[in-house]
Amino acid sequence: MKTLLLTLVVVTIVCLDLGYTLKCHNTQLPFIYKTCPEGKNLCFKATLRKFPLKFPVKRGCADNCPKNSALLKYVCCSTDKCN
């Protein structure tokens, strides 16, 4: 019985994420991502404003959403792999 209880505790610890960590895409390819460092609680995607296909040119983690520029439009979100 003690072995079963210990096993359940170990499995619970392994399965739980002790502290939330955000995962954001960090390349132009949508299937590659990284875990954001502490304090970076947003994912962003930058696209060229004047380009008709809206292909992302930059993705990553941020603490604040970057400001749009004349060349780049930024979209930010706060869930895993949302960019």
From Swiss-Prot:
One of its GO terms (cellular component) is other organism cell membrane. Keywords: Cytolysis, Disulfide bond, Membrane, Secreted, Signal, Target cell membrane, Target membrane. It is found in: Secreted; Target cell membrane. GO terms for molecular function: toxin activity. One of its GO terms (biological process) is killing of cells of another organism. Residues 1-21 form the signal peptide. Has low cytotoxic activity. Belongs to the three-finger toxin family. Short-chain subfamily. Orphan group XV sub-subfamily. This is Cytotoxin homolog 5V. It comes from Naja atra.
